[in-house]
Amino acid sequence: MSSQPVTKAEGVAASGDTRAAFLRKAGLGSAALVAGGSLAGVLPGAAKAHTTPTPPSDVDMLNYALTLEHLEATFYVQGLQVFSRGDLTGAGFLKGFGGRIRSNVYDYFLLIRDHELQHVSTLESLIRGLNGEPVPACTYNFQETAFTSVEQFVSVAQVLENTGVMAYDGAIAHIEAAELLTAGATIATVEARHASYLNLINGDVPFPEAFDTPMAPRKICELVDREFIVECPFKLAAFCELLPDTVTPR
């Protein structure tokens, strides 16, 4: 991985060990790998993967998005079981804000959680509608990476949401069906709203650049696997290798 500094356009400014490390590793300078294959052979009981590499299908790309949404939804569900309303409204990083922002923060986190759960449900329905098999959720290590303090929880939330925007931006060109493009875009814009709010309460610019920076699906997949995932009921590493390593189709 490149150790070059990460710009605002690649996510958010690093200001915390976990966030800094995560975004630094998300730099766009690593060597490219060859993409190809399909989800066959990755899910339990699936057919053996084709020996000739093929571009990922729309179902594969939806399962990629679902992998990220499972992670985000679980993050908020578990995090809001660890941290109470008082933990969030009384957090030190909110002292510079007015009473309205402080009093609303817990309810807004609940709303973000509900959005992510709805994204999971919608993606699962879309995948089944295409006769595909939705990937299940994995086991995550949020206790060590995000739940050490309320400040760390909110900081990692910012990282995840900004990364989600880069992920959708990087995946959209690999979707073929027009109706799926619309579905993906409507999720991506909500992720961007989450990211803007979390940038603000973390003391960063809510909308730092005129253009967001897309990130290749394989890079995102490998990044979240390395940083947050303990194990999965499917072969996540193999799935990551099947995803595109560029933001534009070859």
Segments and roles (model prediction):
Residues S2-T18, G27-A31, L39-R250:
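All-alpha RGS (Regulator of G-protein Signaling) helical domain and cognate RGS-like helical scaffolds
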